Regions:
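A conserved beta-strand element that flanks and buttresses the S-adenosyl-L-methionine
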Residues: 104
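Short catalytic micro-motifs in class I SAM-dependent methyltransferases
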Residues: 107-111
Length: 190
């Protein structure tokens, strides 16, 4: 996905992006949308799987995909149940074994090299069923020397609006060090 040594980070526990809990924006969205259509969810770049477990606790069947073998193994150790699975894989390069009703973005898009972002959009289209939902917590920072790499609303709109209908956009509750820097988007694939 990028030239970053994600496996090395997980092997040495150098994972400052892991906050030990699901995205506050996701937790709030799940609580506010108890009638959202249940189904399958893919969480690319899932790390230790906190977001995967949040989706599963809300009644979805969730798969966490990560490029780091250590992240996947540790995610499994933290906990799995009949609604959670974790799998080693490259979201950008792998062909999907199935398509999902939902794809959830949280820190994967900003972690990849900016020149791979078109690949990311194509990957979402491969993994997501037509009419499926793409829910994203985007981290808006100006830094171009990532990861995380800078992104803004204009880029998100330019990349996703040709393929998705924007249903909702808002500023979510965030981790303390990201307050005011995250924006959530709820999209439906055309």
């Amino acid at each position: 996905m990028s030239s970053t040594d994600w496996e090395g980070h997980y092997q040495t526990n150098d994972t400052p992006w892991d906050k030990g809990e699901a995205s506050p924006g996701l937790v709030d969205w799940l609580a506010a949308h108890p009638d959202a259509p249940r189904g399958t969810v893919l969480v690319p770049g899932c790390g230790l799987g906190h977001d995967v477990r949040a989706w599963a606790a809300a009644g979805f069947t969730a798969l966490g995909l990560d490029i780091s073998p250590s992240a996947v193994e540790r995610a499994k150790l933290v906990g799995v149940n009949e609604r959670t699975k974790f799998r080693l894989g490259d979201f950008l390069a792998d062909e999907p074994h199935e398509q999902f009703d939902w794809v959830f973005e949280h820190t994967c898009f900003c972690a990849i090299q900016p020149d791979r972002r078109a690949d990311y959009v194509r990957a979402v289209l491969r993994w997501l069923k037509p009419g499926g939902h793409y829910l994203a917590v985007n981290y808006f920072i100006p830094d171009k020397d990532g990861p995380p790499f800078g992104v803004d609303r204009d880029e998100i709109w330019a990349r996703f609006s040709p393929h998705f209908e924007l249903l909702e956009e808002w500023t979510p509750r965030s981790y303390p060090n990201r307050t005011g820097l995250e924006r959530m988007f709820s999209w439906r694939r055309r």
